[in-house]
């Protein structure tokens, strides 16, 4: 076994099951958007983490990213702090969009969704479960804190 083969074998062994070694940014973003759509109509459950019994907003984003081979923290405020800020004009499908639902007009993040393009995002809300909304909806727009991207996107 050559040194290169041995190193490759070690690297592959260290990857989580189902991971691809060389995934392009476009492929990763595409996976995030595709996975996002598979959870539409999942019920909302605060603190919930399973699509059959219900999940909250940050469990939804964590699970979507996980299924796309990416790791996010469990809580929306931690997801916010571990991602990179974007100018609104730079947002792309697969990016995260953060809100201050309980304290509009502040930067106290307590809600997160995934931008899917053309002004729309998918999120888990108390009233509708996982569904699509418009960023320009006055209710959400007034509570928008930031759009952010996963490091490497």
Locate each region found by the language model.
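Sec/Tat signal peptide C-region and signal peptidase I cleavage site
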Residues: 18-22
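Aromatic- and glycine-rich peptidoglycan recognition patches
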Residues: 23-34, 42, 49, 70, ...
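Bacterial N-terminal signal peptides that target proteins for export
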Residues: 1-7
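Bacterial N-terminal signal peptides
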Residues: 9-16
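Short alpha-helix capping/helix-loop boundary micro-motifs
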Residues: 78-86
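Secreted/periplasmic proteins that engage bacterial cell-wall peptidoglycan
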Residues: 36, 42-74
């Amino acid at each position: 076994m050559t040194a290169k083969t041995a190193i490759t074998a070690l690297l592959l062994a260290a990857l989580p099951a189902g991971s691809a070694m060389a995934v392009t940014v476009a492929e990763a973003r595409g996976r995030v958007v595709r996975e996002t759509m598979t959870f539409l109509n999942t019920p909302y459950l605060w603190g919930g983490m399973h699509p059959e019994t219900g999940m909250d907003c940050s469990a939804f984003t964590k699970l979507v990213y996980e299924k796309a081979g990416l790791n996010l923290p469990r809580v929306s405020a931690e997801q916010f702090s571990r991602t990179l800020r974007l100018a609104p004009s730079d947002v792309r499908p697969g990016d995260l969009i953060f809100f201050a639902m309980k304290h509009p007009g502040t930067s106290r993040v307590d809600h997160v969704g995934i931008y899917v393009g053309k002004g729309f995002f998918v999120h888990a809300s108390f009233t509708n479960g996982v569904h699509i909304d418009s960023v320009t909806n006055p209710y959400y727009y007034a509570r928008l804190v930031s759009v952010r991207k996963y490091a490497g996107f």
